[in-house]
Curated annotation (Swiss-Prot):
It catalyses: L-glutamyl-tRNA(Gln) + L-glutamine + ATP + H2O = L-glutaminyl-tRNA(Gln) + L-glutamate + ADP + phosphate + H(+). GO terms for cellular component: glutamyl-tRNA(Gln) amidotransferase complex. It holds the Pfam family Amidase. It comes from Campylobacter jejuni subsp. doylei (strain ATCC BAA-1458 / RM4099 / 269.97). This is Glutamyl-tRNA(Gln) amidotransferase subunit A. Its EC number is 6.3.5.7. GO terms for molecular function: ATP binding; glutaminyl-tRNA synthase (glutamine-hydrolyzing) activity. Belongs to the amidase family. GatA subfamily. Heterotrimer of A, B and C subunits. The active site is at residues 56, 131, 155. GO terms for biological process: translation. Keywords: ATP-binding, Ligase, Nucleotide-binding, Protein biosynthesis. The keyword Nucleotide-binding applies. Allows the formation of correctly charged Gln-tRNA(Gln) through the transamidation of misacylated Glu-tRNA(Gln) in organisms which lack glutaminyl-tRNA synthetase. The reaction takes place in the presence of glutamine and ATP through an activated gamma-phospho-Glu-tRNA(Gln).
Amino acid sequence: MITLKEALKYSKEELENLKKELNEKAKKEKKLGAYIEQFLDKDLSVSGEGVPVAIKDNISVKGWELTSASKILQGYIAPYDASAIVNLKANGFAPFGRCNMDEFAMGSSTASSCYGKTLNPLNFERVPGGSSGGSAAAVAGGLALASLGSDTGGSVRQPAAFCGCVGFKPSYGRVSRYGLASYSSSLDQIGVLTQNVEDAAILYDAIAGYDKMDSTSANIEFIKTAPNLNANEKLKIAVIENYVNDADTEVKNALLKTIDMLKANGHEIVYKNLLDSKFDIAAYYIIATAEASANLSRYDGVRYGKRSENIQNLKEMYVNTRSEGFGEEVKRRILLGTFVLSSGYYDAYYIKAQKARAFIKAKYEEILQDCDLIFMPVTPTMAFKFDTQKSPMQTYLEDVYTISVNLAGLGGISVPVAKDKEGLNISAQLICKAYDEQTLLDGALSLEQMIKN
């Protein structure tokens, strides 16, 4: 598969041929389930001219159906382009194909989609991760040059690690959320999934920047990263020792070898510890579900999306529409969020979680005052099998090493570093100071080149 960098040099005719080739591949690989539209006998949606980039089903593209992989939004046509899509088109790219996802971005396996599950291109018995599993599977499976996803607690980095591609979540506010279907407004961030680090920088440069349409957009200077990439920069990297040691044996061993390579290549390695990850899990799921319960209250059968036909009055319309339209995981999180915001529990849970969030952020900032980057696992395990019986709590633990990055509002990237004997991917995660994506991408490029060599 050609890279984004190479495709940007293509003529208009060559790009049209590339899109036809990707269409044919997508139709042949329907079983993978990376694209939502691939179960239909028609071409993938395309919007505008340019290098094709696959788009997650929660990012608005004018004229395209946007469902967040939920029955409740089926039939809703986006009336405008998300700001990230506007920027994408302005920089020579074209939205191309809707990628499958966990319903409303709530999940770690892309198994909760109303369209059916997505498979891992490395092993069809394994999950691709989530919630941007379709975006990761499309890139890793050779059905897309690159894709856009969203990352609320690891939803770009974790599927990238499971499928074996690069997943990059910028700092909170660096890419506009205008036009992104909200899950948790203080945590959501659009990110990129690509074949390599340089492509991640190119695609990030195309979508990043201040946007007056998003009140949480960071109004600070943005300098393009791709032209300034430097893999030779020697960095001080903090290894989170307790997280590396707590990972499964194969993941731990691969990361220890990677740390040795970083040392051998002239990077300064120091060892630090972060809080027990159980605090991250508790704070994240209280804050995320509380915000989700408010954000998803708009789906009531009145304004847009599906409306239940089994109704006698207004109350039944609300109750039946939401009961029929939402999947089990979404209902679970709405109920949890409503509970923690209810009278008598708000102070006990929500306020306490916000205090824990501030403490988590302060701990990251303390380490990054003295270091350029942080190094730790993306996930504690490799991609698990679909038939693995996991409780909701066990599934939530798949994001144990990624959610704190969102709580702190920092940038993070997942870079493949090893394969196990079955060919499953193992990735390392690098984390930067807020808005220091240049250093993050420099470090990631250095790591990538080390592994390739």
